[in-house]
C-alpha cells in the first residue's frame, strides 16, 4: 500500500477483519491539498448558484479549476457499483469556510445523483492545526457537523484527539482515523449492532457563574490529555 492512502487502507483492512475476511474493493480517487469545488460536478455548481462565486477563487488548471477532479476522477467510475464513500477534505477551504456547508451538502447530493440516492457518505472532521487563521477552522468544523446532522445516510468521525503535533497539518495516527471510519460503516452500512462508532457531539450547555457546563452525546466519560483544558472550540 505504499502509493495508497493509509487512511483508506486501514479502513478497508478493518472492514475485511470484521466481516470474516470478506474481500473489500477500494478505489482511490483523491488529490491532496485540494478544495471542494474541483470535486463538484458542473451541474451542481450551476444549479446551486455557486459557480460564479467560486470560479475566480478556483480558476486555473486541475486540480484547482471547478469540476476538474470530478470530471477526471469521479465521473469515470459512476458506472461502478459503489457501496459508499469515505471523504477526508476541508483544510483547503478553511479561509472560505462561510459557504462550505452549502457546498458540501450540494456535492454529496450531486454524487448521489450520479451513483445512487442512498449512497452512504462517511467523512472526517478536520483536525486542529496551528497554521489555521483565527477561528476559521472551528467554523468549518461546525458546518461539517451540521451536514452530518441534517443529511441522511452520512456520518462524521472526530479525529481531534489523534493529533500529536499541532504544527503538522497531517495527523500521524492515520490507522485510528481509518478504523473510526470503518466503525461508522460497520454500524450503519453493515448493521453491526455491537459497534459504537459515534464521536462526542455537543448536546447542550449552560452558564454557571464563570463556568460553562457542557453536555455531550459521548458514551461514557471524557478525558483531557493535559491536566487542564487549554483549548475549546
Per-range role (PLM):
Residues 1-233:
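Cell-envelope and extracellular/periplasmic
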Amino acid at each position: 500500500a505504499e502509493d495508497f492512502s493509509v487512511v483508506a487502507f486501514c479502513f478497508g483492512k478493518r472492514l475485511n477483519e470484521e466481516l470474516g475476511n470478506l474481500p473489500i474493493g477500494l478505489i482511490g480517487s483523491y488529490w491532496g491539498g485540494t478544495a471542494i469545488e474541483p470535486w463538484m460536478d458542473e451541474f451542481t455548481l450551476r444549479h446551486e448558484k455557486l459557480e460564479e462565486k467560486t470560479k475566480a477563487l478556483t480558476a486555473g488548471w486541475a486540480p484547482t479549476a471547478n469540476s476538474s477532479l470530478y470530471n477526471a476522477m469521479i465521473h469515470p467510475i459512476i458506472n461502478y457499483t459503489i457501496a459508499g464513500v469515505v471523504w477526508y477534505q476541508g483544510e483547503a477551504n478553511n479561509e472560505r469556510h462561510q459557504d462550505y456547508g452549502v457546498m458540501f451538502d450540494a456535492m454529496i447530493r450531486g454524487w448521489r445523483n450520479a451513483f445512487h440516492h442512498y449512497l452512504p457518505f462517511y467523512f472526517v472532521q478536520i483536525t486542529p492545526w496551528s497554521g489555521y487563521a483565527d477561528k476559521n477552522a472551528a467554523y468549518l468544523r461546525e458546518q461539517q457537523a451540521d451536514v452530518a446532522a441534517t443529511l441522511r445516510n452520512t456520518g462524521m468521525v472526530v479525529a481531534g484527539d489523534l493529533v500529536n503535533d499541532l504544527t503538522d497539518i497531517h495527523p500521524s495516527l492515520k490507522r485510528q482515523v481509518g478504523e473510526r471510519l470503518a466503525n461508522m460503516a460497520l454500524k450503519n452500512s453493515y448493521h453491526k449492532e455491537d459497534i459504537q462508532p459515534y464521536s462526542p457531539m455537543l448536546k447542550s450547555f449552560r452558564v454557571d457563574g464563570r463556568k460553562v457546563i457542557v453536555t455531550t452525546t459521548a458514551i461514557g466519560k471524557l478525558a483531557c490529555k493535559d491536566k487542564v483544558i487549554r483549548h475549546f472550540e
